[in-house]
Amino acid sequence: MTFRIVNPDALGRPSGWNHGMLAPAGGRLLFVAGQTAPEPGGGLVEQWAGALERVLEVVRAAGGGPEHIGRMTVYVIDRQTYLASLKPLGEVHRRLMGRHYPAMTLVQVQALLEPNAAVEIEATAVLP
């Protein structure tokens, strides 16, 4: 049970994400609430890893894996730090998600509810 990647030529080729992910028929939707690192603090890369690990923990608890995630929304408090951290963030992504790149939206926000949190990640997965 795999997603069909949808990247229309008119939108240009994405890097590290996909424009669309068509869910397989008969899949069950799992909505993962926004997750922050277990101990917010430290840098964006460390917090990103912690938040993504928690997202994956929920997906695994429901019987899925990274390949079942079709969409992620990432909230950051500092867009410039995100842009300056693309290489190490890509390394974290590949370590935790492999070469699976869901559709992704990144939003800069003024603050997150969790004090000292620099990033929060929510996801939607489609499980067999």
Regions found by a protein language model. Name each.
Residues 1-70, 76-128:
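N-terminal presequence-like segments and the immediate start of the first folded domain
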